[in-house]
Design a protein with these regions (language model features):
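Portal/gating segments that form or line small-molecule/metal binding sites
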Residues: 1, 19-28
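Small-molecule-sensing regulatory modules
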Residues: 2-15, 34-187
Length: 187
């Protein structure tokens, strides 16, 4: 499956992350009303936190010896402090604009997340073979992100000069053109 890493962590499923995909990046963060001046995690000691990620929050708070009351909300978590339901929230943050619009500010990042390719650990050999092909293709796209395909028509007497300055793996592909003395150079 292609899923947000944050959801896998929250659901605590025994699923293996095969490949991070590099898109849909976000953070799961604690946020407080903008008039609260501290960024200290201790602020949340004994406070109420609204979230759609109760397992993630409980685990994080326990590791940091913080005891807080967690209110589980499905959607629009950012309104909880404004209606008196919570002292702060924990939610996904990409740009922070939703927090800003609701008078909140990010204080502590619990985890960073992105889209991942994940698999069940009990795949059949046939499905594993299909998955391996998919992984190969995804990794090829990721590796090629910083490369460009160049195609140009070049006079034959300039092919070596142009080839010398092109970034190529081995050598460019050269295809003669109909017009005499010219070739198409691919790299």
């Amino acid at each position: 499956a292609i899923v947000g890493e944050n959801l896998l962590i929250e659901k605590q499923k025994d699923i293996e992350i095969v490949q991070k995909l590099g898109f849909s990046k976000c953070r799961v963060s604690l946020a407080v009303p903008k008039d609260i001046e501290t960024n200290d995690l201790q602020y949340f000691q004994g406070k109420k936190i609204a979230t759609s990620y109760p397992n993630t929050v409980k685990t994080f708070l326990a590791k940091n010896n913080i005891q807080a009351e967690i209110h589980v909300i499905s959607g629009s978590v950012e309104i909880a402090p404004n209606i008196g339901l919570a002292d702060g929230i924990c939610d996904i943050v990409s740009s922070g604009s939703t927090l800003f619009k609701n008078g909140l500010r990010e204080t502590v990042t619990i985890l960073k997340s992105e889209a991942v390719l994940a698999k069940n650990k009990k795949l059949t050999p046939e499905k594993l073979e299909i998955l391996d092909q998919l992984i190969f293709r995804i990794q090829a796209v990721i590796r090629s992100k910083n490369t460009k395909y160049i195609l140009m028509n070049v006079p034959n007497d300039k092919i070596q000069e142009v080839s010398d300055i092109l970034p190529v793996l081995k050598s460019p592909t050269i295809v003669p053109l109909v017009e005499e003395g010219w070739s198409s150079l691919h790299s």
